[in-house]
UniProtKB/Swiss-Prot annotation:
Has a non-vital function. It comes from Drosophila melanogaster. The lineage of its organism: Eukaryota, Metazoa, Ecdysozoa, Arthropoda, Hexapoda. InterPro entries: Amino_oxidase (IPR002937), FAD/NAD-bd_sf (IPR036188), Flavin_monoamine_oxidase (IPR050281). GO terms for molecular function: polyamine oxidase activity. This is Protein anon-37Cs. The gene is anon-37Cs.
């Protein structure tokens, strides 16, 4: 995954930004105007949360707002790469259709001139020992699993005083409920085995969204923050980063500074707030909005903030989990439709041919689905779930290509499947500026940790504020949470000055 992305500025406009500027004109007063001109605001991180916060502040007249980004690329977990004959997303890909004001969908909808498409239903073929599993069985199990993902059985278990041990973590819950469903719904041992392997594939798909093993995930993640992806989301064929480009259209180089890794955040006492970068530059601030990824906070919060953050916030950072969703793309010289006729979900011995002997640890056991990228004739996406993420990121290209080609040949029962020309994969967990890709509720955390992490610090004014996908229960862990949380903290600063003017 490259860190540098060439900004392709387009002649687009955002209707909400223009509207916000007009609203700001109506609210002008001498004191408020002075605050807009003089207040220094530093946003740490140019991911979607940081960019959304800065854009919201700038559109309301707070011109002395600056974003400091450690890498040479803005956009955070939105990272589009040109690959083969298409554009591939190494991070966030789908946009949920959500009409709320601060959603990613609203931003996408207001980005003029950008093509958008709805994901079309794609019934993957489940393969067991080279044979296709009955689609009716797949559809039934998929429906039942979606009910489990919405936590329907959790409240029922609590109310009836059932086996609460199965609620220790998400995997225990899934296994217990799926075993019960299989026992009731399928009588023949062969059908039970097939059903169990389908459920296992769906468990891995769930894990692929969070980027972790489900044994680590608190059952509260299901009840408070449903994870199952929307069935008909939007995607941008030319890359989701076009939306990010639109966000920065009215920012100059002084307001968006890349290649600025932060080494220290001095957040109190009030007159001395500042952000120091590793290159020696220092930025004084009246307000600091921290949008650093949870993985970075976990590793560096103890040395980054001066003074040290309060204990409850440090505990929240420690308790929340941080996964690593993995993206793998393969590009072929000739159209892949010659040998791949649809999305495939391999099960059982297709994933591990040595299962009857001594099971070997192999990353291909975690493959969920192999599918053609919608806008391409030459690029495959390999969906991986469950675990082994760091191991896969470090695997040499040749070894990875050898193993995935072997799996593809077993799936289509043909040794004529060619080797890919190119490989593209993400490396979120090993990137020092991310150290992972998506937060989740670990078995040691709860919704309260999200609220503690999001709480601003400061005696009289919000001096240090926190935004990012780990700071919002609504859409927790998604780009919607990143965007809305950035706007939330920007609005908190705006409201502080509006209140000061009215009280004064």
């Amino acid at each position: 995954m490259q860190c540098f992305k060439l900004a392709s500025r387009r002649s687009l406009y955002n209707a909400r930004v223009l509207q916000a500027d007009n609203i700001g004109d109506k609210q002008r007063s001498p004191d408020l105007e002075a605050a807009r001109q003089n207040t220094q605001i530093v946003v740490v991180g140019a991911g979607l949360a940081g960019l959304s916060a800065a854009q919201h502040l700038l559109s309301h007249g707070f011109r002395r707002t600056v974003i400091l980004e450690a890498t040479d690329r803005y956009g955070g977990r939105i990272n589009t790469q040109r690959f083969g004959d298409t554009y591939c997303e190494l991070g966030a890909k789908w946009v949920k259709i959500d009409g709320s004001q601060d959603s990613m969908y609203e931003l996408l909808r207001n980005t003029e001139g950008l093509g958008k498409q709805i994901k079309q239903p794609d019934r993957a073929t489940y393969l067991q020992d080279g044979s296709r599993i009955n689609p009716a069985m797949v559809e039934l199990i998929d429906t039942l699993f979606r009910q489990l993902c919405r936590g329907f059985k959790v409240s029922e278990r609590v109310k009836t005083g059932g086996d609460l041990h199965s609620l220790d973590n998400v995997m225990n819950y899934f296994r217990t409920e799926s075993d019960r469903i299989i026992g009731v719904s399928f009588q023949h041992p062969k059908d039970q085995l097939a059903a169990r392997e389908i459920f296992q594939s769906l468990f891995k798909e769930f894990g692929s969204i969070l980027g972790c093993c489900l044994e680590y995930v608190n059952i509260e993640h299901i009840t408070k923050c449903p994870v199952q992806q929307e069935q008909r989301p939007l995607y941008v064929p030319t890359g989701l980063d076009n939306v990010v480009d639109d966000l920065i259209q009215n920012m100059d180089k002084a307001q968006l500074q890349t290649g600025k890794p932060v080494g220290q955040i001095q957040w109190t006492p009030a007159p001395m707030k500042s952000v120091g970068c590793l290159d020696g530059s220092l930025y004084n601030a009246d307000h600091i909005i921290c949008t650093l990824p949870l993985g970075v906070l976990k590793s560096f919060a103890g040395v980054l903030f001066r003074p040290t953050l309060p204990l409850d916030k440090m505990l929240a950072i420690r308790n929340l989990g941080f996964g690593n969703p993995l993206k793998i793309y393969l590009s072929y010289k000739k159209p892949i439709g010659r040998w791949l006729k649809g999305s495939l979900r391999p099960l059982g011995t297709l994933l591990n041919p040595s299962v009857e002997q001594q099971p070997e640890r192999n990353w291909t056991q975690q493959v969920v689905e192999i599918s053609q990228v919608p806008s391409s004739q030459h690029v495959l996406e390999v969906h991986v779930g469950g675990g082994y993420y760091e191991e896969i990121e470090k695997l040499p290209d040749e070894e990875l290509l050898e193993q995935i080609t072997g799996l593809l040949r077993r799936c289509v029962s043909s040794h004529l499947v060619p080797y890919p020309q190119e490989l593209l994969r993400s490396n979120w967990s090993t990137s020092a500026c991310y150290l992972g890709g998506r937060p989740y509720f670990s078995t040691n955390s709860s919704a309260r940790d999200v609220q503690r992490l999001a709480a601003p610090l400061g005696e009289k004014s919000p001096g240090l504020l926190f935004a990012g996908d780990a700071t919002s229960l609504r859409g927790f862990g998604t780009i919607d949470a990143a965007r809305s949380s950035g706007i939330r903290e920007a609005q908190r600063i705006i409201d502080y000055y509006l209140k000061s003017v009215h009280c004064g």
